[in-house]
Amino acid sequence: MKAAELARLAGADHGSALAARGQIAELALAARNASAPRTAVLRTAEPRSFGSVEEYARFLAGRTVCLTLLAGAGSRWVASLAAARERGDGRPFDPTRPRGLYPVRDFLTTREGGGAVPIAAYAIAATRDLGRRVIVVRGWEREIEAEILEPIDQAAAGHVGERTFFEQEAPFGKPLGHGDAAWQCRSLWAGAEYVVANFGGDANSRRTILSSLLALDALCACGQEADLLIPAARVPDPAYPIRLDEAGLPRDFGHAKLRGHAGASAGASFGYTNVGVRVYRASALLGWVTHFRSRHWVPGEGYSIPGNDAAGKEFALDNVDAMIAADGRARILAIARPEELTPAKSVDDIPAFERAVESVVREDRAP
């Protein structure tokens, strides 16, 4: 039974998921179609079947918001720009511009990496046609439109899709985390069925995101109690380790930034880590961002969340993930490739990022 197989791959048999990476979308399609009679009775999803993965994806795109968070300049990024200038390398770049606009090799509109596109173009392209876009920014909307969205439109011989820019407020001089960003823009995604969250500096794979979205919907249609699916990669010494229980369900997510520098597991061998992509049931995400805002917001100060770095005053999506996992309603799908865990957080990261996106885009283009 396809539903049981999909549930195993997102649970106890998580170690087999990567080998099935290329079949996950078809498996989710088969599981969803098999669930149609069940959903008609239980009303857990719209009771219909689909003739292809493409048809299934188009159906879900109408019920999904893709929430892409584009970072501002950031102190680490600005420092790396200054260091590159002192060394006489790196590309000329205004340090007040967002990191996501920094030019890197273009594998999206060319196959050889000729020309340049901004870093964030890869995250934007990875959610192409998967839902309505909400792009969280700190200004620079005109440049993002002209330098990222319009070129991707032209390369796709179509359009990136409906999109809305949202500027995250920074009440105390700095943004207070991506969880706070999700809360601030909640009116733009609360009416959706699913929210795909990703970040503008990551080497995202469209195949990973599509497979994860379809898998969560199929699991929900089959009666699985899941509010979050995180595509994961198996890597040595993960900085953001995922702890699984005996059933293969995630119970804890390590996050060094939130916990000071004590969050990472020192000396660990191979383990699972997230690659910066999350797929939520929108209703669950809305409930949890509202919970954190109402329970942990201190007027005039920021967030005070137990377990977080007290000095940061931030609210992260990782906090939401932890609560969903504690309720047993999170799943991992260990289909992500290690290349997807190659973010561009400093100028020194750019060569590795370019190698990673070349590999990721090549696979996404393959049949």
Locate the predicted segments by residue.
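Fold-independent oxyanion-binding glycine-rich loops
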Residues: 70-73, 168-169, 198-201, 232-234, ...
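Short, well-ordered beta-strand micro-motif
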Residues: 103, 133-134, 232, 243, ...
